[in-house]
């Protein structure tokens, strides 16, 4: 228990730093950290509410709480949605990485180790696309949001494909996982298509 608390605190600190670093050029620290803490608070509250009833739904509860916290901050501080999306995705990936790594060590879980490698791959994809997406000829608008949406789309597409074969992976909720993850993957890729057509 104490190990989980320690590594979650560490992950939260990493999340806060990356989130601040990505947004510090456009927003004041008060806005950035208020949004970040709102997201973290949303995750905590969602997990507290669901822990005694549906503990296996911790990932989806965390995602809903996280998004709710950010959404409130976006409206409160008039933040730009896709800037926040991009920043929150790359800030949250290390948190997921730490969760899977800790689980792989604590329970000798091969699936969690594979998930850790996958998260590292997503981080690499994000960093590459963030550096080069404005050069993609088909992405004419050059609008921010491409990197975050690409990673989100790939993340949930992969979850849906894995859920077709396995349902005992950490954070999965059986075959229901397929429908939720597929929907979010489709929405993400459609959002990329829509963004590519818009002028800056």
Predicted regions and their residues:
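A glycine-rich, hydrophobic loop/mini-helix early in the fold
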Residues: 39-82
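N-terminal signal-anchor/start-transfer transmembrane helix
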Residues: 5-25
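Small-residue-rich segments of transmembrane alpha-helices in multi-pass membrane proteins
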Residues: 35-47, 89-105, 143-159
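Juxtamembrane "helix-exit" motif on the non-cytosolic side of transmembrane helices
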Residues: 21-22, 48-53, 99-107, 158-169
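C-terminal membrane-adjacent module
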Residues: 108-200
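Hydrophobic/aromatic interaction determinants used to assemble and anchor large protein complexes
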Residues: 23-29, 33-36
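Membrane-proximal helix-loop-helix units in multi-pass membrane proteins
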Residues: 65-140
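Structural signature of hydrophobic alpha-helical transmembrane segments
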Residues: 1-12, 49-67, 110-121, 179-183
